[in-house]
């Protein structure tokens, strides 16, 4: 039974709490009444009596119970009559509490809710003090703050009254702890009277009135400490750099500092002009950690900036006595002030100040020591790094190659192009090779010309040679070319061996027209020799033709076919021979009946004969005749007609 009762109490408490959180306990549909003496809001520490009266139907309650913040009260409950009960609190000190009462009806397993109340205790407001109104630079608002005094614990409102001393117009602004008033709403006057009224359920208090001139309450833009450094001079000093975006020219500032282990601040005062860089010098203890803060105000005014954020700096580890003589510079306007005790207008605690020298820099003073140290450091660094990079370049071949490639890409090509060396020329190496390089490029065929025949000798038929000698030579030559012996016979014609890579080319012939191309020596009569002499007299110069590398090896030797010996000796002719030969040159191109028609000379070698003259260990290219065979035959027939 006790367990069930506890669950019922928890449910009722949760229900009351839920209802109180959503609109207050007074929104409960009460089955009776509940009131507080002296009231629902009362001064903290007073004695309080809370009454509960039931008005339930069909219920004669056995007991009435009180709950505070969900917990059942057991003491100081008095049953006044059958329907009313009271609970008494001595020196109630809780700021907020919610109370409800229940009734125990016969025949019900749970208590019945009667009613509930939300009660509060607090203090009447104190008169606002230290009323201050300022205009932060660039904000566009007048900000008024004050000291509210001790907490009231109950809802307290603060009303700011702003009254113009020129127009007598008064404006009121509702606030809690501070207020921001737009300067646009204060255009009617420059002088105002400001005070604050604090009001709550327990009382009302007014602050002292404040006379305000809008031009005198402007605070410069916030100051910020950017960095600090300790120099390594003979007497080490710490330079603190700070800045502000204020447009006010005349500003008075304070900078306070202390070690992190000390509770006493040392304050340094100086005039500042934020048109220039702000630097403050301090002679501090070595190897110590210091905290710096700065604040400023317009010169001659009473309102200060709030202290800037703490800036921590660690001094160097150098030790030694320091001379407290201030450092002077032609670029610096220096002021010193001795203050035994500082009582800031916005601060209530006295602060100890030491005798310090304030140094304000105008511009950027040049530091000769810093420049010398930087130059010396740079020279030492360069002297060390140059040998290191040189050694790396010497021993790292890939790095050298990479650097060389990048340099060659950046400089003009003509600066590093080598003069061709003929000893290492690819052309010279190609001529020295014994292998044949085929060239199928038809565009290069037109560049080949016939070489000059420097000498043509004819063996007289009167000279008798042994038959064995002729047959042996001819047989050996033909057998080496893998050609049938019966296919060749002696001839008195000039034999041209074409370049196998380029096909046929027009050549000169001395064969009598209409005669047999291959005439046996035994069948030739002496009369034919005379005509032959005349025919050879016409051949003084010969067209130039060019041989490939493979053909040169073959043509550098003397080729003797029967009585005719064609000797090709390169380099044995001179300019005089060429000139004489040009004067005596007779064209081998035969003239037709029409003087304007020119018939070119043709090759007299058949395809079978040319194939026999090729080198045996080479792959023969396709024989590309310059003229079809039927064209050659037609030319041969026409030549025969001309001779007749």
Curated annotation (Swiss-Prot):
GO terms for cellular component: cell surface; interleukin-23 receptor complex; plasma membrane; receptor complex. Residues 396-644 are cytoplasmic. The keyword Protease does not apply. InterPro entries: FN3_dom, FN3_sf, Ig-like_fold, Type1_Cytokine_Rcpt_Type2. Glycans are attached at residues 47, 130, 232. It is found in: Cell membrane. Heterodimer with IL12RB1. In presence of IL23, the heterodimer forms the IL23 receptor. Interacts with JAK2 and in presence of IL23 with STAT3. Associates with IL12RB1 to form the interleukin-23 receptor. Binds IL23 and mediates T-cells, NK cells and possibly certain macrophage/myeloid cells stimulation probably through activation of the Jak-Stat signaling cascade. IL23 functions in innate and adaptive immunity and may participate in acute response to infection in peripheral tissues. IL23 may be responsible for autoimmune inflammatory diseases and be important for tumorigenesis. PANTHER family: INTERLEUKIN-12 RECEPTOR SUBUNIT BETA-2 (PTHR48423:SF2), INTERLEUKIN-27 RECEPTOR SUBUNIT ALPHA (PTHR48423). Belongs to the type I cytokine receptor family. Type 2 subfamily. This is Interleukin-23 receptor. It comes from Mus musculus (Mouse).
């Amino acid at each position: 039974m006790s367990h069930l009762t506890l669950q019922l109490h928890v449910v009722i408490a949760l229900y009351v709490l839920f209802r109180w959180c959503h609109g207050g306990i007074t929104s409960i549909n009460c089955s009776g009444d509940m009131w507080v003496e002296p009231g629902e809001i009362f001064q903290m520490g007073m004695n309080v009596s809370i009454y509960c009266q039931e008005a339930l139907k069909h219920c004669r309650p056995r007991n009435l119970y009180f709950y505070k913040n969900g917990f059942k009260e057991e003491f100081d409950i008095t049953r006044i009559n059958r329907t009313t009960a009271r609970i008494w609190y001595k020196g109630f000190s809780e700021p907020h509490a919610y109370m409800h009462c229940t009734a125990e009806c016969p025949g019900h397993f749970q208590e019945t809710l009667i009613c509930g109340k939300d009660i509060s205790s607090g203090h009447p407001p104190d008169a606002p003090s230290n009323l201050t109104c300022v205009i932060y630079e660039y904000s566009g608002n007048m900000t008024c703050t004050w000291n509210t005094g001790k907490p009231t614990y109950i809802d307290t409102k603060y009303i700011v009254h702003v009254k113009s001393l020129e127009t007598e117009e008064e404006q009121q602004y509702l606030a809690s702890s501070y207020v921001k008033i737009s300067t646009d709403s204060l255009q009617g006057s420059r002088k105002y009277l400001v005070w604050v009224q604090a009001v709550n359920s327990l009382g009302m208090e007014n602050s002292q009135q404040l006379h305000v001139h809008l031009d005198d309450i402007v605070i410069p833009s916030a100051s910020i400490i950017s960095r600090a450094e300790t120099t390594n001079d003979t007497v080490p000093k710490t330079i603190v750099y700070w800045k502000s975006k204020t447009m006010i020219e005349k500003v008075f500032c304070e900078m306070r500092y202390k070690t992190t282990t000390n509770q006493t601040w040392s304050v340094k005062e100086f005039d500042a002009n934020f048109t220039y860089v702000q630097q403050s010098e301090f002679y501090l203890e070595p190897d110590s950690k210091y905290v710096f803060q700065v604040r400023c105000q317009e010169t001659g005014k009473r309102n200060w900036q709030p202290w800037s954020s703490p800036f921590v700096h660690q001094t160097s580890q150098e030790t030694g006595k320091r001379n407290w003589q201030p450092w002077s510079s032609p670029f610096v306007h220096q002021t010193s002030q001795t203050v035994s005790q500082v009582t800031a207008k916005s601060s209530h605690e006295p602060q100890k100040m030491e005798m310090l020298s304030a140094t304000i820099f105008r511009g950027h003073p040049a530091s000769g020591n810093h420049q010398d140290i930087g130059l010396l450091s740079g020279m030492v660094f360069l002297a060390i790094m140059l040998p290191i990079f040189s050694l790396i370049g010497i021993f790292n071949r890939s790095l050298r190659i990479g650097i060389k490639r990048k340099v060659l890409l950046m400089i003009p090509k003509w600066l590093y192009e080598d003069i061709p060396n003929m000893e290492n020329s690819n052309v010279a190496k190609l001529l020295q090779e014994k292998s044949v390089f085929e060239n199928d490029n038809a565009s290069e065929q037109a560049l080949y010309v016939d070489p000059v025949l420097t000498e043509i000798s004819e063996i007289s038929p009167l000279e008798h040679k042994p038959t064995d000698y002729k047959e042996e030579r001819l047989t050996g030559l033909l057998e080496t070319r893998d050609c049938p012996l019966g296919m060749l016979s002696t001839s008195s014609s000039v034999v041209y061996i074409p370049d196998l890579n380029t096909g046929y080319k027009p050549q000169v012939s001395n064969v009598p027209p209409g005669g047999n191309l291959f005439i046996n020596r035994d069948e030739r009569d002496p009369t034919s020799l005379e005509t032959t002499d005349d025919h050879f007299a016409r051949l003084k110069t010969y067209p130039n033709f060019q041989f490939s590398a493979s053909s040169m090896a073959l043509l550098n030797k003397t080729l003797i076919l029967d009585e005719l010996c064609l000797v090709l000796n390169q380099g044995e002719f001179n300019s005089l021979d060429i000139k004489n030969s040009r004067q005596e040159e007779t064209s081998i191109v035969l003239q037709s009946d029409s003087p304007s028609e020119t018939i070119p000379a043709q090759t007299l070698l058949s395809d079978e004969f040319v194939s026999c003259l090729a080198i045996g260990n080479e792959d023969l290219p396709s024989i590309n005749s310059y003229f079809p065979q039927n064209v050659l035959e037609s030319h041969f027939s026409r030549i025969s007609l001309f001779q007749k």
